[in-house]
Amino acid sequence: MTIPYIVIIAAVISFIMWIVYNKTVLGKNMFAIGGNAQAAVVSGINVGATLIAIYVIAGALYGVGGILEAARTGGATNNYGNMYELDAIAAAVVGGVSITGGVGTVPGIIAGVLIFTVINYGLTFVGMGPYWQLIIKGLIIVIAVAVDVRKYLARK
């Protein structure tokens, strides 16, 4: 049994992003801007340049993801990734990323992706219809956001 190339590429990219987020100035600036952009400006961070770097990195990763998905399926259409954003948001929130910003880790996001992938495959395996799957995913997001807001309010 071999490891799929997509898993290897995802692991390498995750490791690189962990290094960027935890060991570089850009990563610390990203964390600061996510927590409070005004405080980041006051502390001397060039928010504009950092946001441009974030969007460039995100765009490159979206492109890599699209290429890998097209390679996996053998083709692509203009609406192929439709509703993937729901899965991405849900996986991030389940992985511990705060809706209020400034909180989250790369390992937490990976755990959220793995948990949500298991949920997706499990719902498909038991024969649940796609509309019910969307409802369940939405409920998971609502519950995760409610827990996040509760934690946020408890800190205040």
Region roles according to the model:
Residues 1-31:
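Alpha-helical transmembrane segments of multi-pass integral membrane proteins
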Residues 2-10, 51, 55, 109, ...:
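Residue-level signature of transmembrane alpha-helical entry/exit and packing/kink sites
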Residues 9, 46-69:
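Transmembrane alpha-helices
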Residues 14-22, 66-70, 95, 124, ...:
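Structural signal for membrane-spanning alpha-helices in multi-pass inner-membrane proteins
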Residues 15-16, 42-49, 121-156:
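Cytosolic-side transmembrane-helix boundaries in multi-pass membrane proteins
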Residues 23-25, 99-107, 154-156:
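Membrane-helix interface "capping/anchor" motifs
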Residues 26-51:
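Short cytoplasmic-facing helical segments at TM-TM junctions of multi-pass membrane proteins
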Residues 55-56, 61-63, 72-135:
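Transmembrane alpha-helical segments in multi-pass inner-membrane proteins
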